[in-house]
A protein has these predicted regions:
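Substrate-binding pocket helix/loop in short-chain dehydrogenase/reductase
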Residues: 97-98, 102-107
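Active-site helix of classical SDR
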Residues: 121, 157
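Residue(s) in the substrate-gating loop at a strand-loop-helix junction
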Residues: 141
Length: 264
């Protein structure tokens, strides 16, 4: 979506991390911003921080709760307007071996990371189809490209996002609809979500990640990997290397399989 001025933008997980930064960047582009977050204190703080920057609204929403998604979507349509840009950003991680996950850990991770983007999109996609206009940006992860110990359920949830998001893009293309989909796959970001992670590849700066995402939306990019070589390197390696060689390269040379050993 090349022109964001006066567009209505909904950002889930918008009261902290890259979600909050993206909200600020959207306001700086004269967009109107709606924040969904589970933390009311952070919502209030964000609204206070941004009140002089433009039209910004905040709603406390647990995106793992379908009723809350549906009720708050209705409030937006009734009281504010039709969403032009949806950024599915909310996410959680449980950094444990799979056998250490509780059932709640598994269910909650999949509900928030995988199910919520689809269910939230369902609430707003019909309006976009009716207007033949809109942009949906789904924040996945480079973890959705590669297997990794101590984040198996998180990885599964992000694989889901990538597969669904890009399939939706192709569906909309087949329907000749002017609705753009951007799938984002960043490496670890220094927002506090991945405290304790140790990596040979530099941890990403959240300000730079958020800016790259907004620019990708403005340019209608179909996919964004940060850093850019991650996607090409991963897919190329998976295509040409036997599994044991790929494991050696990824685990020992790149150190990826050990990044979560000190996760807190």
């Amino acid at each position: 979506m090349k022109h964001l001025e006066q567009k209505l933008v909904l950002i889930t997980g918008g009261a902290s991390g890259i979600g909050k930064i993206m909200a600020r960047l959207m306001l700086e582009r004269n967009a109107k911003v709606i924040i969904w977050d589970i933390d009311q204190l952070k919502i209030d703080e964000t609204l206070s921080d941004f009140k002089s920057k433009g039209a910004v609204f905040g709603f406390k929403v647990d995106v793992s709760n379908l009723n809350q998604i549906q009720e708050n979507a209705k409030k937006i349509k009734r009281d504010i307007g039709v969403v032009d840009v949806l950024i599915n950003n909310a996410g959680i991680i449980v950094g444990k071996y799979f056998h250490e996950h509780t059932t709640t850990d598994v269910v909650k991770t999949m509900e928030i990371n995988a199910n919520a983007p689809m269910l939230i999109t369902k609430e707003f996609l019909d309006d976009m189809l009716d207007r033949n206009s809109g942009h949906i940006c789904n924040i996945a992860s480079s973890g959705g490209l590669i297997s990794n110990p101590k984040m198996s359920v998180y990885v599964a949830s992000k694989w889901s996002v990538i597969g669904w998001s890009d399939s939706l893009r192709i569906e909309l293309k087949q329907m000749n609809k002017n609705i753009d989909i951007t799938t984002v796959m960043p490496y670890y970001i220094n927002t506090g979500m991945f405290d304790g992670v140790r990596s040979k590849i530099p941890i990403l700066n959240p300000e730079e990640v958020a800016l790259n995402i907004i620019k990708a939306i403005e340019k209608n990019k179909k996919m964004l990997t940060i850093p850019g070589y991650i996607y090409r390197l991963t897919r190329f390696g998976q295509a040409i290397m036997p599994i044991n060689i790929f494991d050696w390269f990824t685990g020992s040379v790149m150190g990826i399989y050990k990044t979560m050993e000190h996760f807190t």
